[in-house]
Structures are given as C-alpha cells and as structure tokens.
C-alpha cells in the first residue's frame, strides 16, 4: 500500500463559481501539456467552467514567479480577478548546477508570491532527476506507472479557492 500522494479531500468542493489561472512554462512542452490537461480535466470534474480557466505562458520555470504576479495583476485590472493560480513548470536535472539554482529560487519565489497576490498559489513545479521521472509524474510514461500530478494541482486549486479564497469568508 502506497502512503505517498495527496489524500482524499474532506469533502467534494464545488468549483462552479471560481476563476482559475494557469500559467505554464514552455520548456519540456510535452510534459507541460499533459500536466495542464490533467489540471483542467480535474477542475472541470469539480464544476469549474471552461471559460473560467484562463491560461498564459512564460518561456521557462524561472520566469514563473514574475509572470504569475503580472498575470494575476492583469486579470484584476481587467475586472476579472482570479481566485487561485497554478504556475506549472518542469525542471529536469542536467549535468550542471542550473537545476539546483532554478529549483530553489523558483520554489521560494512561488511560496512568497502567495502573500503578495493575496490568493492561493498552487505549487505546480515538477523537479525531477530524470526525464523518465517527469514523464511518469505527468502520467505519460510508457508503463503508466504514476498518475498525472496536474490532476492533484487542479483539485488543490478548487479546494483552496473554495475554502480560503476571497469569496470564502
């Protein structure tokens, strides 16, 4: 029996009244696309309407924190504020220290961003040692050895927006 992974939610959350932003990097696009698709499908199953899922891109994972902040601000300025945002990126270790620097700085920046934007920022950054690990965590490896983590991020987005979003209190 596996003990890892997201546990079952304490209830089913209705996402029909929330607006979700997804901002994703373009590096490792096959994996990114699968993760985004998983998040969208899971949110749709929880009632989030397709027209309330807004998608934006940035070049790479390092650009996610700044891009996310600007994305959130722009939606608010347009009078269509988001309730939650999911930055999605995939980092795969190579032979240099690049992986460590980008993983660490991006993780901390995304964590700190929640206070700046005053909304839940779901951690959608895969940090994998190999391409095979990334494919597995996107649910697209040949053996289908794992589920798509994008589904977890979509479920977390709905739960956090409903429980703790601006309209929750």
UniProtKB/Swiss-Prot annotation:
It comes from the Eukaryota. 5-amino-6-(D-ribitylamino)uracil binds at residues 27, 61-63, 90-92, 123. SUPFAM superfamilies: Lumazine synthase. It catalyses: (2S)-2-hydroxy-3-oxobutyl phosphate + 5-amino-6-(D-ribitylamino)uracil = 6,7-dimethyl-8-(1-D-ribityl)lumazine + phosphate + 2 H2O + H(+). Its EC number is 2.5.1.78. GO terms for molecular function: 6,7-dimethyl-8-ribityllumazine synthase activity. Induction: Is constitutively expressed at moderate levels. GO terms for cellular component: cytoplasm; mitochondrial intermembrane space; nucleus; riboflavin synthase complex. It is an enzyme of class 2 (transferase). The active site is at residue 98. It is found in: Mitochondrion intermembrane space. (2S)-2-hydroxy-3-oxobutyl phosphate binds at residues 95-96, 137. Keywords: Mitochondrion, Riboflavin biosynthesis, Transferase. One of its GO terms (biological process) is riboflavin biosynthetic process. Pathway: Cofactor biosynthesis; riboflavin biosynthesis; riboflavin from 2-hydroxy-3-oxobutyl phosphate and 5-amino-6-(D-ribitylamino)uracil: step 1/2. HAMAP family: Lumazine_synth. NCBIfam families: lumazine-synth. Homopentamer. This is 6,7-dimethyl-8-ribityllumazine synthase. It comes from Saccharomyces cerevisiae (strain ATCC 204508 / S288c) (Baker's yeast).
């Amino acid at each position: 029996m596996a003990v890892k992974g997201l546990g079952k939610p304490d209830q089913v959350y209705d996402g029909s009244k929330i607006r979700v932003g997804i901002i994703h990097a373009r590096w490792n696009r096959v994996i990114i696309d699968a993760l985004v698709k998983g998040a969208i499908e899971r949110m749709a199953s929880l009632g989030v309407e397709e027209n309330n899922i807004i998608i934006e891109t940035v070049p790479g994972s390092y650009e996610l924190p700044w891009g996310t902040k600007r994305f959130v601000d722009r939606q608010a300025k347009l009078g269509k504020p988001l309730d939650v945002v999911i930055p999605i990126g995939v980092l795969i270790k190579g032979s240099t220290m690049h992986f460590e620097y980008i993983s660490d700085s991006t993780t901390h920046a995304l964590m700190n961003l929640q206070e700046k934007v005053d909304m839940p920022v779901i951690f959608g950054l895969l940090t994998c040692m190999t391409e095979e690990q990334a494919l597995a965590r996107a649910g697209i490896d040949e053996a289908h050895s794992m589920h798509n983590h994008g589904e977890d991020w979509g479920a977390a987005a709905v739960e956090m927006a409903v429980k703790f979003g601006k309209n929750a209190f």
